[in-house]
Amino acid sequence: MKRFTLMLAGVLCASASFATDYYVSVDGSGEKNGSSWENAIAFTDMCSKINEYQNGDVFYFQGGTYYVPAKVPTVSNGYSFIGASTGTPTVFSGDVNCDGVPNEGDASSLLFIQLATKNGDDSKLFVLKNITFTGAYVNQAKTSALRVDNSGRVDVQNCIFDKNVSVYSKDNNYGGPACLLERSTVNFTDCKFINNESIGRGGAIKLTSDGATKGYTTFNRCLVSGNKASSLGSAIFFNHGQELNIINSIVAENNSGTEGEIGAIFSIGAENKYARQITIINSTIAGNMGGAQVLGRKNAAIRIANSIIVGDGTTPAISLQEKPKLVLSAGYNIIGMYQVDEASTTAWKTSDFVSDNNTLNSIFGNNAVTNGPVAAPYGATQVQMEAIAKDWSLGQNLKQDINGVSRGDIAVPGAVVAEPLKGKFGITDAKYATYYHDFGYIMPEGVKGGVVTDAKVEGTLVVDYKYGSGSVVPAKSALLLNGAKNNYEVALKLEETSEDVNLLKGTSDESLTTSDEAGAKFYKFANDKDKGIGFYWGADNGAAFTNSANKAYLVVAGEASAAKGFALGGVDTGIKEVTEVGKMAGKIYNLQGMQQKGLQKGICIVNGKKFVVK
């Protein structure tokens, strides 16, 4: 009997741990117990006893508009609220007076979650999926369409926050009419925050906290657009907290006022209690009007990788008041005007493209920001992104863009996969050409690129063809190209600057050749009628000459500069010519490593060295 009692108790405990599925419709149907769609529970009935259900229960909401009660209950258990994935959307609306606009008489909050759990504690995991939050009219402190407080983990997926308005403006307890997140860990995936409006402190989203271990927010594949606030973040206000992660996301076309601290994303600086670290990766922040795209106070802490941040050219892309605590780049970014009030510790990489000339128009042209750039080189490869994610301890999926499109092995920076900026060069019948570009690029099929590592006084060059087809060529590489006659198009790439030992230099436009070496002479790539293709003086006595755009030239100093030219027929490839068989010693092999009986015409290997037998 004792054994049976224990077994029964175990069964009862186990059954209590299983989640129950409930089905909800606006008015309910059948028996209204939520056991099926035919017996769906009415929304108002569900709300009236929301905390009587078991932690982990799942609520499926039929498509339709759910008008929230006048006083929204505080939800203290971990549930899943799942709206319709097809057909009529599931909408939580605050439009109580049914006039179609947020105003007096409408609800100030649509859902309030307060789980009383620590950061990362998923014992009360709350999931929101496929729900639109709209029509909240915030006219009191600490309210929002979605308010989350003191909750260790809330996941919000494929939700829309549209046309929520905040008119409250007292005691700094305002802003964030779409989402007010307090001392919580919230992850947004595939969500949209559009057309929300606040007097200030976050046109759509406000993040705040009260402790050193709380306040972590992540946006992955999200769109924040069309929101308004007079100051302190037309899109996002990062007040207090530890981390704000913007990944594979777009923040665009939000509107600030004209006075005060104005910008799309605003953050107070780091301090002992609040790290306030912003991480922007694989994201696009562009086309926001009024102030900077990203604005930070003293001690701002920002990390950026493989992203695009550009304004209209009249205001900064990034503006940091006084000296920031950290502006760390992992490279592969396109950044517009960068403004810091005092000297900073910004560590831009040579793979970053930072220029005041990078603007909304120059990068996106006639494209909407959501359609991706028209003039961006490739950014980081997937291998490079994985290294960055590991270094920054990011556990997010970086393999897809905001639309769920695969980034493949390589893609342009920012949130949207798009065609990369292209470069061009031609190779003639001579099978040689030179090429230089400020960006890196992918070597096309059938072409190899070499650096000149040495020049001999007798007029020969040592060329290392280290960049084969498909390889990534570093930025600012001046190369000798060898391949079949053709006009080639190359995909340009943000890449670290070349550190190759190379006597070739180049220019991105028509410019005079230069060198830091005393007595250096300059050689132009040309086809000499007597000596053939090679590098020859481009001006009298090897003086400087005007080099063509995207072409390489040769710089030689020292004894070898006595040579007037270096014909490519005299390139030192490491292969020696042998015509006297009697001087050969040792076993003879072909290039496939097979031993030969005696010398045969062509290239062979003797004692580890290559020889040409004629």
Give the residues covered by each predicted segment.
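Sec/Tat signal peptide C-region and signal peptidase I cleavage site
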Residues: 15-19
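Acidic Gly/Asp/Thr-rich repetitive segments characteristic of extracellular carbohydrate-active
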Residues: 25-62, 403, 589-597
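Short, T/G/N/S-enriched strand-turn elements that build extracellular solenoid repeat scaffolds
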Residues: 44-52, 67-75, 113-115, 296, ...
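Beta-solenoid repeat scaffold
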Residues: 54-100, 115-131, 157
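Predominantly extracellular beta-rich ligand-binding scaffolds that present long acidic/polar faces
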Residues: 70-80, 155-157, 181, 187-190, ...
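Right-handed parallel beta-helix
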Residues: 121-231
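A short, polar beta-strand/turn micro-motif
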Residues: 420-445, 468-532, 539-574
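C-terminal outer-membrane/trafficking sorting elements
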Residues: 454, 571-614
